[in-house]
């Protein structure tokens, strides 16, 4: 049993052949005792492996475009502008010497040389 769907009928026409067209999808039902509304399947022009390859290709294309955009944006953010020199680092590195204070009296050190309580 085949159910054809198509455009609404044209006013004044009752011929079923003018309602359906060649581009209209055809729905078929399986004859296993189920009601007509259950299990409608669309008749495809392609086989199942071809449809699977098409879907996987579209998914790979979308994922590839997303990865390409992420790569390009990462490369553009890394490059500093050619006219502006790179900013000096404000974070001291491990190899850099500690900053020297001009006031030696108030500078703090981690090692004490004399004890204030020792009065000999």
Curated annotation (Swiss-Prot):
The lineage of its organism: Eukaryota, Metazoa, Chordata, Craniata, Vertebrata. The keyword Lyase does not apply. Glycans are attached at residues 2, 5, 7, 13, 17-18, 20-21, 24, 28. It comes from Equus caballus. Residues 107-120 have a biased composition (Polar residues). PROSITE patterns: GLYCOPHORIN_A (PS00312). The modification Pyrrolidone carboxylic acid is found at residue 1. Belongs to the glycophorin-A family. Residues 17-29 have a biased composition (Low complexity). It comes from the Eukaryota. The chain crosses the membrane at residues 50-72. Keywords: Glycoprotein, Membrane, Phosphoprotein, Pyrrolidone carboxylic acid, Sialic acid, Transmembrane, Transmembrane helix. The keyword Coiled coil does not apply. Pfam families: Glycophorin_A. This is Glycophorin-A. Gene3D superfamilies: 1.20.5.70.
């Amino acid at each position: 049993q085949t159910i054809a769907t198509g455009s609404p009928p044209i006013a004044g026409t009752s011929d079923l052949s003018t309602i359906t067209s060649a581009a209209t999808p055809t729905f078929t039902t399986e004859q296993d005792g189920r009601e007509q509304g259950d299990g409608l399947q669309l008749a495809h022009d392609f086989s199942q492996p071809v449809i699977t390859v098409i879907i996987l290709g579209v998914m790979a294309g979308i994922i590839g475009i997303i990865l390409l955009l992420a790569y390009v944006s990462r490369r553009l953010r890394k490059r500093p502008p050619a006219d502006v020199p790179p900013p000096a680092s404000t974070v001291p590195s491990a190899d850099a010497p500690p900053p020297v204070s001009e006031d030696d009296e108030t500078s703090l050190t981690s090692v004490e040389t004399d004890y204030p309580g020792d009065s000999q």
